[in-house]
Amino acid sequence: MCLGAVFVLGGVGMAVSQVSSAYPNLCKLITGWVKTSLPEDFPFSSLQINYNYAARKHVDGNNIGPSYIRSLGKHTGSELWTVDAFVEATDEDTGEKYVKGGGGQQVLSCSGGWKLFNGNAEHYTKPYQGTRISFIAFSHNAYNKLSTRVASKLKELGFTAASDDGVDLPYFAKYRIDKSEFTPDENSK
């Protein structure tokens, strides 16, 4: 189940998920909990909630990259394997610290707290036993290209990455790939 921003096929485009619209109070309760437990500077437009689901190896296609995962419930196992861990880096121009890929394979324990991972790198859930509910906070790569109505509704529901201005939030600026200098053939890759 995905709360928040989703891409709807059939010409609809970016929208508020049906479950978010159908259960706005539940959505506000969950986003409120997420905002109080995540690092305060992490913006998110969407929340994926899974019940007893172990994701196979995949890459998140519409995710700008940085994602936080946490699992709840009485279970053992369920770590997240990722092919490319984030490592801390420093911007040469500003001296500002940020995270980037390049850390190599990593296994993250998702129980008991939020763990940062790169949704654009291959990842999967390791086997587990018991009851497991996982929450993944992320931002859709079109979080800043929403209609005014959709952006407003997402903010009302508690999502912190939703706009119609096309400008990246500072947190995400380093993760956006600028393809404007590539040839058309390179852009299709």
Language-model segments: residues:
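Polar low-complexity intrinsically disordered regions enriched in Ser/Thr and small residues
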Residues: 7, 13-16, 76, 98, ...
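Double-stranded beta-helix
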Residues: 130-188
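Catalytic core of non-heme Fe(II) oxygenases with the double-stranded beta-helix
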Residues: 26, 39-128, 132-146
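Extended non-catalytic scaffolding segments
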Residues: 1-2, 6-7, 13-14, 176-189
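Intrinsically disordered, compositionally biased terminal peptides
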Residues: 2-5, 32-33, 80, 159, ...
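A general marker of short, structured functional hotspots
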Residues: 3, 19, 54, 167-171
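Non-heme Fe(II)/2-oxoglutarate
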Residues: 1-41
